[in-house]
Amino acid sequence: MSFRCFSFALFLLLLTFISHVSASYIPNKKSFKSRSFKNQFLIPQNIARAAVGLRPLVWDDKLTHYAQWYANQRRNDCALEHSNGPYGENIFWGSGVGWNPAQAVSAWVDEKQFYNYWHNSCVDGEMCGHYTQVVWGSTTKVGCASVVCSDDKGTFMTCNYDPPGNYYGERPY
């Protein structure tokens, strides 16, 4: 099978995965480390990486704990602010409580349409940095977390990446 066919097949697999994930899945403290929760973050990111010929990310508990710590910091305000920590980071906010990890990853990966590889830049007026972090070639580990914010302010999710990516002037892969 050619690389293009393989990439297209992986893309279809990602769409199938996302369409079958329940929109009502909200992890509690006990389940934030569950295999299903991890896989909802990990599998679609690894499909996006495979589509551009990269090795899969490995789930990392240290990054997961950092992500959970930071998500807990955002619980009261649900603000889309980065932690400014030592890792690469993607953040997501959705109104209400019906959001799942695969939807957050889908929002990040959907930015691919705004990334111009040849110019190594985003289309004017669009974001693509979440996508480029997902597919950053030297990144090997990821850990993610989610919280439902206070006073019905929404759902906040974050993934942290090590080594970090998105270095100015460098292509992701």
UniProtKB/Swiss-Prot annotation:
Family matches, as InterPro entries: Allrgn_V5/Tpx1_CS, CAP_dom, CAP_sf, CRISP-related, V5_allergen-like
GO cellular component: extracellular region
Phylogenetic lineage: Eukaryota, Viridiplantae, Streptophyta, Embryophyta, Tracheophyta
Superkingdom of origin organism: Eukaryota
Signal peptide extent: 1-23
Function of the protein: Probably involved in the defense reaction of plants against pathogens.
Alphabetical GO biological process terms: defense response
Gene3D superfamilies, per database record: CAP
Protein name in UniProt: Pathogenesis-related protein PR-1
Keyword Disulfide bond on entry: yes
Keywords, comma-separated and alphabetical: Disulfide bond, Pathogenesis-related protein, Plant defense, Signal
SCP domain mapped to chain residues: 45-161
Family note: Belongs to the CRISP family.
Record's keyword annotation contains Transmembrane: no
SUPFAM superfamilies membership: PR-1-like
Disulfides per UniProt: 78-149, 122-128, 144-159
